[in-house]
């Protein structure tokens, strides 16, 4: 959540920054009204409290002096009763402000490029040259069918559309990728975690999925539980409402989980193959960092994801997202896009974000800085999306007869 005090004192500046993310200034004006309502409610309540304190002191004085307190006591009781609706009004005003503030996205960094959507993202560098084929490369679904690797029909039968079944060598390759990703992340200093695949609403609110994106989540009926859309949720919230020692920063975490998303806004997009599924596997990196060095941690995470792709021999490019393509919680995001020769285009395979103190404020994650507590910075990113890496290997390592080679670094895992 953005700093409400900063928003109140710098409304025009915040409004201008959020326009970079496509947030209409008019939608923020309601917040100004709520700020005013809360200020007025608190002023009335504080005035009533001041009067109550004054009468309470007078009450004690009357008793010491032996004066008749009947009339004064009636006034004290009446004022106390009058404070009840004032307290309720202040509480309701604060809750209304908080509810609206939860739906306001994070401020983009000043360095984030201007732009409306992914077409305006900025390519920073290309890593590895795409392979030159002497035949027409096939797309992954054709290769999967030829090799019997992915069963889309049985995925639909078992669940619904956008589910699939991996079998044989594809299932083994999926497991190999997960182990390779986790091993690499651990070698870079990330501690491995195995976390619940369901989290409660408070955790999803902490990382920003709730309340704004509830329609994209799978909720467990009659339970305060949701299937996680990413391991970012449990890993970041590992320190929900906790105070860390400054010496322990940064905290680097990694974990493998399946991820579950309704893909509510993706109707008609990537309907064939495994690019966009309701359930997919991912290895996540999460960092809880000191505000002074979160940029260094961010660069390390980007490099780590790129190094994994390089080790797999997969051509990719590094792209900085423009304001209009930034996620809700992100202040800055770098995407890694892998080359898919069958589609003849780069596709996102990792998205690494620095949320600054946005998630930390929502999740109350702090560190002890001398005598005071400060909010940490939280960062997250894939290293990597497993299914999309599997697709990239299939398309980049295919032979003319449809068989698929295995990258050298994965052979020991298979």
Curated annotation (Swiss-Prot):
Record Pfam families: Seryl_tRNA_N, tRNA-synt_2b
One Gene Ontology CC term in the entry: cytoplasm
Broad enzyme group: ligase
Binding residue positions for ATP: 261-263, 348-351
EC code(s) of this entry: 6.1.1.11
Pathway: Aminoacyl-tRNA biosynthesis; selenocysteinyl-tRNA(Sec) biosynthesis; L-seryl-tRNA(Sec) from L-serine and tRNA(Sec): step 1/1
GO biological process terms, semicolon-separated: selenocysteine biosynthetic process; seryl-tRNA aminoacylation
Annotated keywords: Aminoacyl-tRNA synthetase, ATP-binding, Cytoplasm, Ligase, Nucleotide-binding, Protein biosynthesis
Subcellular location: Cytoplasm
Keyword Membrane appears in the UniProt entry: no
GO molecular function: ATP binding; serine-tRNA ligase activity
Record carries keyword Lyase: no
Catalytic activity of the protein: tRNA(Ser) + L-serine + ATP = L-seryl-tRNA(Ser) + AMP + diphosphate + H(+); tRNA(Sec) + L-serine + ATP = L-seryl-tRNA(Sec) + AMP + diphosphate + H(+)
Binding site for L-serine: 230-232, 284, 382
Domain-level remarks: Consists of two distinct domains, a catalytic core and a N-terminal extension that is involved in tRNA binding.
Subunit description: Homodimer. The tRNA molecule binds across the dimer.
Entries under HAMAP family matching the protein: Ser_tRNA_synth_type1
Stated role: Catalyzes the attachment of serine to tRNA(Ser). Is also able to aminoacylate tRNA(Sec) with serine, to form the misacylated tRNA L-seryl-tRNA(Sec), which will be further converted into selenocysteinyl-tRNA(Sec).
Family the entry assigns: Belongs to the class-II aminoacyl-tRNA synthetase family. Type-1 seryl-tRNA synthetase subfamily.
Protein name: Serine--tRNA ligase
Gene responsible for this protein: serS
């Amino acid at each position: 959540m953005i700093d409400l005090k900063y928003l109140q004192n710098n409304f025009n500046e915040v409004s201008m920054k959020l326009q970079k993310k496509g947030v209409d200034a008019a939608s923020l004006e309601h917040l100004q009204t709520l700020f005013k309502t809360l200020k007025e409610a608190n002023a009335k309540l504080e005035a009533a409290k001041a009067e109550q304190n004054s009468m309470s002191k007078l009450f004690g004085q009357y008793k010491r002096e032996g004066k008749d307190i009947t009339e004064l006591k009636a006034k004290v009781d009446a004022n106390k009763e009058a404070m009840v609706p004032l307290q309720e009004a202040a509480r309701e005003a604060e809750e209304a402000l908080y509810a609206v503030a939860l739906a306001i996205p994070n401020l983009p960094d000043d360095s984030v490029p201007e732009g409306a959507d992914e077409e305006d993202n900025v390519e920073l560098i290309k890593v590895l040259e795409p392979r030159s084929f002497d035949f027409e490369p096939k797309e992954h679904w054709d290769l999967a069918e030829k090799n019997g690797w992915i069963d889309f029909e049985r995925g639909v039968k078992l669940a619904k559309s956008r589910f699939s079944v991996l079998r044989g060598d594809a299932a083994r390759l999926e497991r190999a990728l997960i182990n390779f990703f986790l091993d690499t992340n651990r070698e870079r200093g990330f501690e491995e975690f195995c976390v619940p695949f369901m989290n409660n609403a408070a955790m999803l609110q902490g990382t920003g999925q709730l309340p704004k994106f509830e329609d994209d989540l799978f909720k467990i009926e009659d339970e305060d539980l949701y299937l996680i859309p990413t391991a970012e949720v449990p890993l970041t919230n590992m320190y929900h409402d906790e105070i860390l020692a400054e010496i322990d920063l940064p905290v680097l975490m990694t974990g493998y989980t399946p991820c579950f998303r309704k893909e509510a806004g993706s109707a008609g997009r990537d309907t064939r193959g495994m690019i966009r599924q309701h359930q997919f596997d991912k290895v996540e990196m999460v960092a809880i960092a000191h505000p002074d060095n979160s940029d260094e941690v961010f660069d390390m995470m980007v490099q780590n994801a790129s190094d994994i792709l390089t080790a797999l021999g997969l051509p990719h490019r590094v792209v900085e997202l423009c304001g209009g393509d930034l996620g809700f919680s992100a202040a800055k995001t770098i995407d890694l896009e892998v080359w898919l020769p069958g589609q003849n285009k780069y596709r996102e395979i990792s998205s690494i974000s620095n949320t600054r103190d946005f998630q930390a404020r929502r999740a109350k994650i702090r560190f002890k800085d001398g005598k005071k507590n400060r909010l940490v910075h939280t960062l997250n990113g894939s290293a990597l999306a497993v299914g999309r890496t599997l697709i990239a290997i299939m398309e980049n390592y295919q032979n003319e007869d449809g068989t698929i080679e295995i990258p050298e670094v994965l052979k020991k895992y298979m």
